[in-house]
From Swiss-Prot:
Residues modified to N6-succinyllysine: 108
Residues that bear N6-acetyllysine: 13, 29, 108, 128
InterPro entries, per the entry: ConA-like_dom_sf, Galectin-like, Galectin_CRD
PROSITE patterns in the record: GALECTIN
Gene name linked to the record: LGALS1
This protein's name: Galectin-1
Keywords, sorted A to Z: Acetylation, Apoptosis, Extracellular matrix, Lectin, Phosphoprotein, Secreted
Amino acid sequence: MACGLVASNLNLKPGECLRVRGEVTPDAKSFVLNLGKASNNLCLHFNPRFNAHGDANTIVCNSKDGGAWGTEQREAVFPFQPGSVAEVCITFDQTNLTIKLPDGYEFKFPNRLNLEAINYMAADGDFKIKCVAFD
């Protein structure tokens, strides 16, 4: 998959927050934020789908270990709107990643790779990143 943004050597530690803010395109179908060790070792594949892959207004999360996808987790809460600005905050520990959505709703996704640091981020799709911050 071609990526709009790829960053490496992030060294995000447990408890630190990764904030990603950007604009959802007016004709958005989906976008992706991938976090992990490398492109084939992802602790989080975060994929809000407006209308893509048979899903509508659904957030699909997954992990990838050595290139093999895990089991998808779906979230029905969908605060994203085409043509709007959105911010997502992601923190993690040894057990879970916590994803805070633009409306303040939080959900957890298991840290299946047991990563102690997140060094890789990639973004793609119908989301123009304006700011990436570490808190």
